[in-house]
From Swiss-Prot:
The keyword Transmembrane does not apply. One of the primary rRNA binding proteins. Required for association of the 30S and 50S subunits to form the 70S ribosome, for tRNA binding and peptide bond formation. It has been suggested to have peptidyltransferase activity; this is somewhat controversial. Makes several contacts with the 16S rRNA in the 70S ribosome. Residues 33-57, 224-278 are annotated as: Disordered. The gene is rplB. It comes from Mycobacteroides abscessus (strain ATCC 19977 / DSM 44196 / CCUG 20993 / CIP 104536 / JCM 13569 / NCTC 13031 / TMC 1543 / L948) (Mycobacterium abscessus). Transmembrane segments: none annotated. It holds the Pfam family Ribosomal_L2_C. This is Large ribosomal subunit protein uL2.
Amino acid sequence: MAIRKYKPTTPGRRGSSVADFSEITRSTPEKSLIRPLHGTGGRNAHGRITTRHKGGGHKRAYRLIDFRRHDKDGVNAKVAHIEYDPNRTARIALLHFLDGEKRYIIAPVGLSQGDVVESGANADIKPGNNLPLRNIPTGTTVHAVELRPGGGAKLARSAGSGIQLLGKEGAYASLRMPSGEIRRVDVRCRATVGEVGNAEQANINWGKAGRMRWKGKRPTVRGVVMNPVDHPHGGGEGKTSGGRHPVSPWGKPEGRTRKPNKASDKLIVRRRRTGKKR
């Protein structure tokens, strides 16, 4: 994938860029693998906004992605197409299995139309193949990693993300996450070899607010420009700093959103960014 830049023919075009979609080989999805997707506009069943800054956007169909793959062990599949998925940053690959079934997987770097992929403990170590962590050599970069055996891929699914297998000891494997966190995961958990493709997606300059609206993202308004009735930082004569530490519209201090006593925290060897040992 490459990034295409535009000449500044309009203010919205100036500086904006798009993906060139050169790796895409098919423009319409497999009909048997899509489901309708109904937007909520950030509202719950009572019609109240529970998630701000959501609403509108282009109509989408959800592509059913196979995040498990364990039921296809030993059945080879050919990559029929690399497709665009509006519901995620990564590209997806349409697989045609030898038994006639079709499925989508996340497309890693190096996977192209016509390649053959497989899953199972005896699969080769090459991009797109799915194996248990115990069968993957130390130092390999993987993605779509399970947190619990058979639970389906949960880690490293977005564009450009990858997890490094640092080592294996007993029933656990040590993984370095994209955030820098080092975590232990059961060696029976499965992972797909390679790094997720479309890494250049992070370099796209969206250029104008309208492109965010196409994606279903509404504006984010700062509290300091609101009135006192709307936000704790609102009001004041002229421009003000808010006069207090950052808080939410309901007065809760910013940050500290991570659950401090989550059961799986005991498997974290080194925290992200901070480098503190547990």
